[in-house]
Amino acid sequence: MTGVHTMFHKRYEKHVENHQTRRAILSGIASTLGVSVMSPWTRVLEAAPATSATKAKKVIYFYMSGAMSHIDTFDPKPEQPSIQGDVGVVKTKTPGIMFGEHMTNLAELQDKLAIVRSMTTETADHSKARYWLQTSYPVLNSIRHPAMGAWVSNEMGKINKALPPFVLVNSGGNGHPGAGFLDPSLTPVPVADPEKGIENTELPSYLTDEVFKRRLSLADRIDAGFRERYAGYQLESYNQMYKDAVKLMGGSDLEAFDLTKEKEEVKERYGSSKVGLGALLARRLVEKDVRFVQVDYGGWDMHNDVAGSMAGKAPALDQALGALIRDLDSSGLLNETLIVLASEFGRSPAINQNAGRDHHPAAFSYVLAGAGIKGGAVYGKSDEKGHGIDEDPVGITDFNSTITVACGLDPNKEHFAPNGRPFKIGGGGDPIYDVLS
């Protein structure tokens, strides 16, 4: 383990140890003294600039699993040839702002994007960093925190009552935090392959609708005693999920998951890659008022041949995001849909002996677009070699709190887990108002 990794792991472990106790101790002291602790959010609100009334109603969240390189995408360093390596750069609409050479579509759309170039996190471990990004909290053995999609769906509710509020594309769901301690109905519906949609939704040829209804009725009668004996909100939630699934099987809204309904020229614009098809499916789902769609796209753990690996990975992402943003903008849905592009951490500016880049949590970049976002914004600054942060460092909780505010939600609202501990949607971070419209 490198010195950088050791430092961040120690900070991470200290964070886990202290994170949950500070507010409880302060609140306890305040209660004893008969006073209250002023919420930090109160001071944030006093200092926060006014934002427009346009807030996101839906979210499409692109998660780049494996840790995407900032040097080769949204924070290139062409003035440092040994750092930049063999991946070139491309100009954007803003003079002086450049992207990696494979981001040609997004360079043309830079006026619709907000780039955060000063992200930093506290661990270089994939699983821990992934969990922290998706939940706003470090891993704890005593509790499972909700993913951002579950948080947002819980607070904002369903729009389309016939469809699930939270869909997870290109992932089987293994290792995903899901609903955490929230209602089980907020668990994301997984779509492992966008071309197949939700599988096993059609009745087999030997089973008629009438026979299926009779079987459902019989199952309901058999389960009645169990439901009465073990009545509770969790059991009721699972029962409701089952009913919703049956309702979806017979409804027209299921077509939202069917990519065969799209014209071939549309599919070609998005591309045939997993992320291209995932982006197309995400567009169809938000058109049908699904609240939160997460699209996973793995393969960014480029320890070897980063230039060749980027050439095989980044163009598909650029094509998919470019097509999605243009389509949503054309239909007017970009005004109510927040698009997020994030990865668990970054990759080292220094190119290793295998022509790749290693794990690097100290500096990396994220992208926001759409509802609630100030297009053309570039926030924060990494140092001249992209190794650390020179200006305006942004932590994971700050970024997730920014998503929270973009959705019109209060990042200071507390939710209590079954063990009595308070948690917040964005983990109590400071929203980045400079990228909010």
Where are the language model's segments positioned?
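Ligand-binding pockets and gating/stacking loops
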Residues: 2-437
